[in-house]
């Protein structure tokens, strides 16, 4: 089953809001449209909307998702409530406070341009938890400061320069790319092939406000955008995300959790395929799902 390696599902209350706005106008803290809408919504509304998104992820074969969770400690608790009783496992990276990190599985930083984050990084390391940070989304200026924090992974990396690619390789820092989101926000698209040559690369769907949390759609877009094999894209959507978070899923091996997505190879869409992996990555969709075992 899939591992969605970067999400913001809190803005499930505002799907397709903000058409035509820039990245900063959409999501920059504290007053981007997303943050305004989150403040205006009740806790009940946000929990209900997040649960609908998690149910959609379950239907489309996602076993776990790495969530950068707004709202401090309360935001962490709200997401856990939204996921209660469902088969999908949220891996929550708290934001805004050290206390949110302590309540979650780690800390998700907005980006080095928004703050220094050394205190949060130190506290996260002391807790033995995961630290991720956005970098290189708008431009390259925040990549070196992000790498200086020794993060466990970076998100986006749309604008790496040769020096940054060398540092990624030297430090073996994984990267999560979200190409559909980057296209929607008009910041460019990540150099997926260059990144994949140098480090572990995973796929995420980013904000539900901007894109459905469908790994089928993300795989298809990435595969048709980048000069990488279908096998590599499938790993990006499964094993590599699990590896970043230390999850016991994303690959079928003896001793691992049996979290499986079963597709109907005789569906109208998949009947007659000549390359199964290529078809799963570039063609399959929710209509081809026969079963999800989580």
Task: Map each language-model feature to its residues.
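C-terminal cap of metal-dependent C-N hydrolases
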Residues: 257-294
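Divalent metal-binding segments
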Residues: 25-75
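Metal-coordinating catalytic core of metallo-dependent amide/deamination hydrolases
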Residues: 41, 68-148, 152
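Histidine-centered catalytic micro-motifs
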Residues: 2-12, 130-138
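Active-site gating loops and adjacent loop-to-helix segments of metal-dependent hydrolytic enzymes
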Residues: 12-46, 144-149, 174, 222-229
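Non-catalytic positions within long, well-ordered alpha-helices that form the structural scaffold/packing
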Residues: 51, 55-58, 100, 147, ...
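Active-site-adjacent C-terminal substructures of enzyme catalytic domains
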Residues: 141-251, 261-268
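Hydrophobic beta-strand scaffold residues
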Residues: 64, 90, 131, 174-175, ...
């Amino acid at each position: 089953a899939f591992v969605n390696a970067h999400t913001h599902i809190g803005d499930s209350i505002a799907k397709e809001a903000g058409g035509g706005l820039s990245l900063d106008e959409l999501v920059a803290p504290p007053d981007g449209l997303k943050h305004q809408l989150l403040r205006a919504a009740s806790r009940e509304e946000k929990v209900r909307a997040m649960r609908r998104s998690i149910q959609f992820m379950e239907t489309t074969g996602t076993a776990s998702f790495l969530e950068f969770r707004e709202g401090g400690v309360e935001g962490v608790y709200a997401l856990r409530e939204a996921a209660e009783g469902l088969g999908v496992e949220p891996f929550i990276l708290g934001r805004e406070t050290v206390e949110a990190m302590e309540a979650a599985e780690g800390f998700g930083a907005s980006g080095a341009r928004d703050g220094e984050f050394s205190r949060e990084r130190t506290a996260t390391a002391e807790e033995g938890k995961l630290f991720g940070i956005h970098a290189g989304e708008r431009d390259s200026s925040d990549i070196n400061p992000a790498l200086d924090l020794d993060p466990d992974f970076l998100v986006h990396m749309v604008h790496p320069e040769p020096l940054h690619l060398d540092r990624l390789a030297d430090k073996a820092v994984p990267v999560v790319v979200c190409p559909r989101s980057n296209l929607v926000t008009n910041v460019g698209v990540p150099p997926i092939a260059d990144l994949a040559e140098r480090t572990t690369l995973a796929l995420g769907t980013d904000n539900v406000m901007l894109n459905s949390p469908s790994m089928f759609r993300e795989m298809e877009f990435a595969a048709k955008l980048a000069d990488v094999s279908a096998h590599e894209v499938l790993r990006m959507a499964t094993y590599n995300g699990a590896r970043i978070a230390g999850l016991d899923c994303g690959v079928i091996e003896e001793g691992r959790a049996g979290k499986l997505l079963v597709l109907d190879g005789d569906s109208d869409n998949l009947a007659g395929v000549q390359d199964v992996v290529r078809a799963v990555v570039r063609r399959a969709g929710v209509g081809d799902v026969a079963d999800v075992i989580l």
